[in-house]
Structure formats: structure tokens, C-alpha cells
UniProtKB/Swiss-Prot annotation:
This is Putative pentatricopeptide repeat-containing protein At4g17915. PPR repeats lie at residues 12-46, 47-81, 82-116, 117-152, 153-186, 187-221, 222-256, 257-291, 292-326, 327-361, 362-392, 393-427. It comes from the Eukaryota. The keyword Ribonucleoprotein does not apply. GO terms for molecular function: mRNA binding. Keywords: Repeat. Belongs to the PPR family. P subfamily. The lineage of its organism: Eukaryota, Viridiplantae, Streptophyta, Embryophyta, Tracheophyta. It holds the Pfam family PPR_2. NCBIfam families: PPR (TIGR00756). It comes from Arabidopsis thaliana.
């Protein structure tokens, strides 16, 4: 592809940017770099968009340091980074929960006379929330934005509402929603975020009230809205009510996308009604919907639930023959499915092959592997993967602490828990109780007293 473009005399900076963007999306960063060099040789100079595209690719698929190195090359080429440059770097660092790096990038922006925009602050707030630093996130909303002369818009509130809901602070989210209503009309996405949060908290009545508010605002519930409510019914084992809602909406003329069918199928799988699940999948095909990666993921989940590994292998072969690209969820299903069916070595081999194929190892897959290996009794193997993880969240640490306790490694669990407190990572009190009671049960009374005192001291220091 690159060689062909070198011979193309009509190459312009705009075309160069389009090609670089395509290569980056397909993770072909080396080819993108070669294309830029070839463009320069042909007299086509890259601009800030070219480098920003490259930086975004490195942030997503390689690493922050590699992405940051591109900014030095930009300046060497006489091109000044802009706010979009730093937003990509900030997003990449925030995705990896590298708060110190995010704050450093903010400082550097200001030093270069580049002012953060709403997107920059939205990303910072999201990072604070993921790390459990809620006060800092609200300080950004009520103080930093005001000092920067920026007015929070719907996107800012959506970020905050989504973070509050995911952290379980539903009442705070509802209060913030009222504040938002006093400033401007919430978007359909806002209602969907709140309905999703309420459904995950299993607050059925409030979710129904929010749906009524959505309709009063002049919006029509979309597939996302109803799929969210369907999932609530299915999670609370109200399978019959969920199926009734699904059929009612179909009769009323609502067009369901594949996701609604997959929600129905997933619920039927979880309740052991695999025959009905197959029938719904066949109905989806009869309606003219070809299998895409989402439907294949649902089928993979179905086959793993049945323990039908032969069908899994056949389906993976079909995906490959059709030239379809498995997504992160596909690989998570495979790793989780293999672990649940006792195929721990195959799960590890697949996990390792993901890295070899250049597939980003997302946090969910890593957590899944570590937790699954621990539960299968392979704690030492799990800990090796845990130590190699670049990004860890509250679930990672909580899972490992509990699994270490189950394996009677209370001292190790205590040290890990203390490191979490020192880093300001919020861990459920159940993990603290498990560690302290385990130390006492194993006769380590001195260790228990020492650990309790250190935990208390650290918690007071972080408050």
C-alpha cells in the first residue's frame, strides 16, 4: 500500500492524513510512520493532524511514552502541538489510570500556552472517578472549569453522571441530574445513562419514573433504553416480564436491533433455557440479519455455557473463514469460557496469543484470567499475570485480596491491601475484614494488630 502511494503523484497532505488514519485504525503504526517519511520525500509535509492521528494510535495500541515521543518530533519539525494533541495523550494516560501523568500533561499544556478545553477536563474528571477520588472530580466541575472560563455542557454532566452511576452513587447522580435540568435540557443519552445506572442498582421503580421523565421531555425511547430495561428484568430473574416487554414493544412497532435479541438470548442462556435461546437466534437470522461479531459473541457465550467446546471451535473457525475481526469482548468470552470449563492452560495460551497478535489486553480480560486462575487453585500462576498488568482497578485488587485469603495467604493479602490504601485505591470493607479475620484465625495476632493499625492510619491520612 505504501509503495503504491509513493508512486502516486497526486498525494497531498489531506490524502496523507486519510491514509495515516486508516493505517493507525488497523494498528499498522510502522506502515503509517513509513508513509509519513515517504510523503516528506515527495515534498508532502505532514501537519498537526498527521501527528495527532499518529499520537492517538500510539496511545490506544502501544503506550503513552511512545505517543509522547511523537510530540518531540513534531516540535523538531516546526509543528506546534495543539489541544487535540494533548487530549489524546491525556485520554491515553487516563485510560491506564495514570493520574500523575495526566496532571503532568495538564501542567505542560499551560506551560506551552495551550489551554485545556472541556474535553480535557471531562477526561480528568473521569480519571478521578475511576480512582475513587470523587471530591477532586467535583472540584474540577465547580472550581477548575470556572477558573478556566469554561461552562460545563451536557457532555460534562454525562461524564459525571456515568461515573457516579458506575461507582454506585445513584442518589448523588439524581441530585446532579436536577442541577443539570435547571441549566439546560438533558439529552436522550443522559436519560439512558441514568436508566442504566438505576437498572444496575436494581431500583426498578425509579428507573420506571426516569423512563416517564424521558417521554415527558419529548424524547422517544430508543433500542438502548428498552434493552437496558430488558436487562434489568432479566438480571432480577423476571424472565417472563422481560419477554413480555420485548414482545409488547415489537407489537407497538418499535424496531429492535440485534442487541435486544442478544439481551433476551443471554437471559435465556443464564437460566438454562438454551433451546429457546437457539430459537431466538434463528429468528434473528430469518429476519435477514447476518451474523456479525456481536451475534457470534452471543453464540460463543451460549456454547461455553453448554460446555460444547467442539461447537466453540467450529464457530471460531467460521469467524476466521469469513474474515471477521474478533473484538475485545470476543477474547474475554473465550478466556472466561475456557476457565469456566476447566481449560486453564488453553485460556492462558489464548491470552498470550492475544499479545503476540498485537491485540490490546484490556482490563476486563486480564481481571478475568487472574480471577479464574485463582479460583481454579493456580494462585502462583495468577499472581505472575497480576504482577505483569500495567493497569489495575478496584476489582483487580479486591479479587486478588479475596483469593489470597481463600488460599490462606493472609500476610501476602495484608501487604497488598495496605499498598492499595497507600495508593488511595478504595477497596470494599469486606476485603479488610477477610484479611484481619484470616490473620487472627491463622494465629498471626501480632500481624493482625499491626495491619489494623496501619490500615487505620492510612485511611485517616487519605481522608
Amino acid at each position: 500500500m505504501v509503495r503504491g502511494l509513493v508512486n502516486f503523484t497526486g498525494l497531498s497532505t489531506r490524502l496523507l492524513n486519510i491514509c495515516v488514519d486508516s493505517l493507525c485504525k488497523f494498528r499498522k503504526l510502522e506502515k503509517a510512520e513509513s508513509l509519513i517519511i515517504d510523503g516528506i520525500r515527495l515534498g508532502v509535509d505532514p501537519d498537526v493532524v498527521t501527528y495527532n492521528t499518529l499520537i492517538s494510535g500510539y496511545c490506544r495500541f502501544v503506550g503513552i511514552e511512545e505517543a509522547y515521543a511523537v510530540t518531540r518530533r513534531m516540535r523538531d519539525a516546526g509543528i506546534r502541538p495543539d489541544v487535540a494533541t494533548y487530549n489524546s495523550l491525556i485520554a491515553g494516560a487516563a485510560r491506564r489510570l495514570m493520574l500523575d501523568h495526566v496532571l503532568y500533561l495538564f501542567d505542560e499544556m499551560l506551560e506551552w500556552g495551550i489551554y485545556p478545553d472541556l474535553w480535557s477536563y471531562n477526561t480528568l474528571m473521569c480519571c478521578y472517578f475511576k480512582l475513587g477520588k470523587h471530591e477532586e472530580a467535583f472540584r474540577v466541575l465547580y472550581k477548575d472549569l470556572q477558573l478556566a472560563g469554561l461552562n460545563p455542557g451536557p457532555d460534562t454532566y454525562n461524564v459525571l453522571l456515568d461515573a457516579l452511576c458506575k461507582c454506585g452513587y445513584i442518589d448523588n447522580a439524581l441530585e446532579l441530574f436536577k442541577e443539570m435540568q435547571s441549566r439546560f435540557k438533558p439529552e436522550l443519552m443522559t436519560y439512558n445513562i441514568l436508566i442504566n445506572g438505576l437498572c444496575k442498582s436494581r431500583r426498578v421503580g425509579t428507573a420506571k419514573w426516569m423512563l416517564t421523565e424521558l417521554k415527558k421531555s419529548g424524547y422517544t425511547p430508543n433500542a438502548v433504553t428498552y434493552t437496558t430495561i430488558l436487562k434489568l428484568y432479566f438480571k432480577t430473574r423476571r424472565i417472563r416480564r422481560g419477554l413480555q416487554l420485548f414482545l409488547e414493544m415489537k407489537r407497538e412497532g418499535y424496531t429492535y436491533d440485534g442487541y435486544a435479541y442478544f439481551a433476551v438470548v443471554s437471559a435465556l442462556i443464564k437460566t438454562g433455557r438454551t433451546k429457546e435461546a437457539y430459537e431466538y437466534m434463528q429468528e434473528l437470522v430469518r429476519k435477514g440479519r447476518r451474523h456479525d461479531i456481536v451475534s457470534y459473541n452471543t453464540l460463543l457465550n451460549l456454547y461455553f455455557k453448554d460446555g460444547n467446546l467442539d461447537a466453540v471451535d467450529d464457530l471460531l473457525g467460521e469467524i476466521e473463514r469469513r474474515g471477521m475481526k474478533a473484538d475485545e469482548y470476543t477474547h474475554t468470552i473465550i478466556v472466561n469460557g475456557l476457565l469456566r470449563t476447566g481449560q486453564t492452560r488453553r485460556a492462558e495460551e489464548h491470552f498470550v496469543s492475544m499479545g503476540e497478535m498485537g491485540i490490546g489486553l484490556n482490563l476486563v480480560t486480564c481481571n478475568c484470567l487472574v480471577d479464574g486462575l485463582c479460583k481454579a487453585g493456580h494462585v502462583d500462576r495468577a499472581m505472575r499475570y497480576f504482577e505483569s498488568m500495567e493497569v489495575k482497578d478496584e476489582y483487580t485488587y479486591t479479587s486478588v485480596v479475596h483469593n489470597l485469603c481463600k488460599d490462606m495467604r493472609f500476610v501476602c493479602a495484608s501487604k497488598l491491601l495496605l499498598s492499595c490504601y497507600n495508593k488511595g485505591i478504595k477497596i470494599p470493607t469486606s476485603a479488610r475484614r477477610a484479611v484481619l479475620s484470616g490473620l487472627r484465625m491463622s494465629g498471626c495476632y501480632g500481624e493482625a494488630r499491626k495491619a489494623k493499625a496501619e490500615m487505620k492510619l492510612t485511611l485517616v491520612g487519605n481522608s
